[in-house]
Amino acid sequence: MAANKPKGQNSLALHKVIMVGSGGVGKSALTLQFMYDEFVEDYEPTKADSYRKKVVLDGEEVQIDILDTAGQEDYAAIRDNYFRSGEGFLCVFSITEMESFAATADFREQILRVKEDENVPFLLVGNKSDLEDKRQVSVEEAKNRADQWNVNYVETSAKTRANVDKVFFDLMREIRARKMEDSKEKNGKKKRKSLAKRIRERCCIL
């Protein structure tokens, strides 16, 4: 009799997170801090880097897959493909750069266009909270935008690690809740189809 195989990575729930935002706002720094507990200040502009990690989410072991996309306009054309594969989005700007905050509206619009879903799991993230003296975007301004979009707003610092775990775990919870919701809807449709089929069969017998 074969021994039971240990639970492999393939059987763990996988949550796919996409990092979006302008170049230089700290998307890669946040990702690397979450993955490796390291702050990397000088980082080459990313085309797209993918990371995977096992974490414990509310007592359950899961995998998170993080795709760190490029902020530069040169790569805008290939973003659609990345967005299609994502289940949730961390939309990052720097609190020290108003332009990067303004750009979040374009990223949000592009995501909604590709996903065709206004309720896609999404967090607005104001990074570089350690640079309070250089702040250009007020908390109130960012929260107002998040409220308009019906999403949560969190400020982070990749340097001090403030709220880094929080944004990834909060987004994973949103993704998980969405999957459960979709699964219920799917099962409901299957039950309705099955019931309709039984009614049709009964009508044929009669």
Curated annotation (Swiss-Prot):
The modification Cysteine methyl ester is found at C203. InterPro entries: P-loop_NTPase (IPR027417), Small_GTP-bd (IPR005225), Small_GTPase (IPR001806), Small_GTPase_Ras-type (IPR020849). Higher levels where found in testes followed by brain, adrenal gland, pituitary gland, ovary, liver and kidney. Low expression was found in muscle. The modification Phosphoserine is found at S194. Prenylation is essential for membrane localization. Its main location: membrane. This is Ras-related protein Ral-A. It comes from Rattus norvegicus.
